Amino acid sequence: MADHPAYIELKGICKSFGPVVANHNINLSVEKGEIHALLGENGSGKSTLMNMLSGIYSPDAGEIYLDGKAVSFSEPAESIKAGIGMVHQHFKLVDVLSAKENIVAGKEKAGFFIKQKQLTEEIRAIEEKYGLIVDPDKKVYNMSVSEKQTVEILKVLYRGANILILDEPTAVLTPQEITKLFD
């Protein structure tokens, strides 16, 4: 048994929607650096569980711990502030904006004007760190599905996520795009 708390710990998590029980008494521990996959049939509660961790839903019962401290998120902005980023199965990108514009949209920055060169450098640093490369000036409507997925991942990393939740990351990808995404 470890002498330190798990980085993420879910204890006794329950969530219902009316009479439908989505999660009942779920326990999960994740250490730093670990990769976990939740497998189950459609409607088995996987996305609901991750939506609670990312602040979209609140559990009806149970507790969530992050690095040993109890946390409660009432909205996604709170979970991203805590370092949890979620990439959803259905992209949340603006088609007429570039990759760079989508990555930084909604991110609070000091000052009124955002320096484009600085943004490009910040995004490039994240791309190089994680090996996720995308043309920052390419419009989303001209991107492949895997490029859009990459932009979504870069978006949460740009916001400071150190916990990355991918909800069905390969559901809309071709076999070639899956290989590229996880390469």
What are these regions (language model features)?
Residues 2-183:
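Glycine-rich phosphate-binding loops of nucleotide-dependent enzymes
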